Swiss-Prot record:
GO terms for cellular component: chloroplast envelope; endoplasmic reticulum membrane. The keyword Membrane applies. It comes from Glycine max (Soybean). This is Diacylglycerol O-acyltransferase 1A. The lineage of its organism: Eukaryota, Viridiplantae, Streptophyta, Embryophyta, Tracheophyta. Residues 1-67 are annotated as: Disordered. The chain crosses the membrane at residues 102-122, 146-166, 178-198, 203-223, 253-273, 295-315, 342-362, 410-430, 432-452, 465-485.
Length: 498
């Protein structure tokens, strides 16, 4: 027997009864005897009385429908009618739980989450008061961070230099090896120049992080710009030699070095260069205003959680590698929830709000800045889905070029994580002036987790196992531990300087 998920209701039973005793078209509203008699009378009547017949039928419809419903109800759920007809499972049993809709439970979780966090916020304010201060983000030194600001503005020099090199290469004024060397010099200078400025200036943490993020974005864009133009020159030479290009390239633009294309690429929410992008027809001003309001609100929420919850927790903690183990575990677990809230707010503010705002202003069409990484079954799925601009850059300019040069997939994956770890370390360690390789080690630790979660996924064929491991390692253990490590090292450094 087939197991049905639909519960049998009274309406279903009524329907079954009506199906078993469905009247014919001629006897829909009358009994069989009445139908036989009336049919004989109708043959004797004049055919010109159609209007009177239709009027009588219209008047008798409510009464006839009521009689039919009563007839159906008369035989519905009688004691002799079986109440159990099919083999059925309970809605929460293991065989049917994932085929049920849990929208009501999801709403309940939201209500409970709002209620519990509202109580915690009120309790925190009553116990500790208003703790928000700007000193951690913008101190008196922030006004003296003008070298970092000037360095940020001067980063546009490097794309302009790359454009000059590409223009010379297009006109065949310099050979290809010289083009490659010049691009290596330009991209390296665009990254090391901000690092030197930050290390020489004792700037605020947020100012240093902002400059390093800008520098990393410029470096990634310059690499994509140089690599894409190099590949387009190679394809152009192949066409000139008469070689046929495969249709899978999908290149709908010619090789042309344009400063307008470079300028648009520098401000567009993408890290992969191409001479033209899909564009939307117009700017939605109302939608843009709503996203700006959301950005302001969620940025404020993120700052509130950091100052009101995370800072007091880390200030009242010990170094996780030097104190009591149980105490360190308690601090990490206590820090995990507000840290997760901040990370989710950061993701929503940057990847959803800010990048979409920038795309709307520039009419940038491809807005797949992330995928459903929260459903990641493995650690590899998470890194492939949560940051699509970086992921597309990695597979376009690093991973597949490694495969084309005969490097095994495992080694290419290791190289991709190595590059990611280096940039994570630069963005955190340089502004903190601390080089303990905590961020680097945290990213490289993902490599064995990739193979472990892939093995578990293939062994158990259960998405829940990998997803829970991902959430535990990522939000409960990894990030809070890194926050505590960098905070205490930063405080120790400030104490030594003072």
């Amino acid at each position: 027997m087939a197991i049905s998920d639909e519960p049998e209701t009274v309406a279903t039973a009524l329907n079954h009864s009506s199906l078993r005793r469905r009247p014919t078209a001629a006897g829909l509203f009358n009994s069989p005897e009445t139908t036989t008699d009336s049919s004989g009378d109708d043959l004797a009547k004049d055919s010109g009385s159609d209007d009177s017949i239709s009027s009588d039928a219209a008047n008798s419809q409510p009464q006839q429908k009521q009689d039919t419903d009563f007839s159906v109800l008369k035989f519905a759920y009688r004691p002799s009618v079986p109440a159990h007809r099919k083999v059925k499972e309970s809605p929460l049993s293991s065989d049917t739980i994932f085929r049920q809709s849990h929208a009501g439970l999801f709403n309940l979780c939201i209500v409970v989450l709002v209620a519990v966090n509202s109580r915690l916020i009120i309790e925190n304010l009553m116990k500790y008061g208003w703790l928000i201060k700007s000193g951690f983000w913008f101190s008196s030194k922030s006004l003296r961070d003008w070298p970092l600001f000037m360095c940020c503005l001067s980063l546009v020099v490097f794309p302009f230099a790359a454009f000059i090199v590409e223009k010379l290469a297009q006109q065949k004024c310099i050979p290809e090896p010289v083009v490659v060397v010049l691009h290596i010099i330009i991209t390296s200078a665009s990254l090391f120049y901000p690092v030197l400025v930050i290390l020489r200036c004792d700037s605020a943490f947020l100012s240093g992080v902002t400059l390093m993020l800008f520098a990393c974005v410029v470096w990634l864009k310059l690499v994509s710009y140089a690599h894409t133009n190099y590949d387009m020159r190679a394809l152009t030479k192949s066409v000139e030699k008469g070689e046929a290009l495969p249709d899978t390239l999908n290149m709908d633009y010619p090789y042309n070095v344009s400063f307008k294309s470079l300028a648009y690429f520098l401000v567009a929410p993408t890290l992969c260069y191409q001479p033209s992008y899909p564009r939307t027809p117009y700017i939605r001003k109302g939608w843009l205003f709503r996203q700006l309001v959301k950005l302001i609100i969620f940025t404020g929420v993120m700052g509130f959680i950091i100052e009101q919850y995370i800072n007091p927790i880390v200030q009242n903690s010990q170094h996780p590698l030097k104190g009591n183990l149980l105490y360190a575990i308690e601090r990490v677990l206590k820090l995990s929830v507000p840290n997760l809230y901040v990370w989710l707010c950061m993701f929503y503010c940057f990847f959803h709000l800010w990048l979409n705002i920038l795309a709307e202003l520039l009419r940038f069409g491809d807005r797949e800045f992330y995928q459903d990484w929260w459903n990641a079954k493995t650690v590899e799925d998470y890194w492939r889905m949560w940051n699509m601009p970086v992921h597309k850059w990695m597979i376009r300019h690093l991973y597949f070029p490694c495969l084309r040069h005969g490097i095994p997939k495992a080694v290419a994956l290791l190289i991709a994580f190595l590059v990611s770890a280096l940039f994570h370390e630069l963005c955190i360690a340089v502004p903190c002036h601390i080089f303990k390789l905590w961020a680097f080690g945290g990213i490289m630790f993902q490599v064995p987790l990739v193979f472990i979660t892939n093995y578990l996924q293939n062994k158990f064929r259960n998405s829940m196992v990998g997803n829970m491991i991902f959430w535990f390692i990522f939000s409960i253990l990894g990030q809070p531990m890194c926050v505590l490590l960098y905070y205490h090292d930063l405080m120790n450094r400030k104490g030594k300087l003072d």
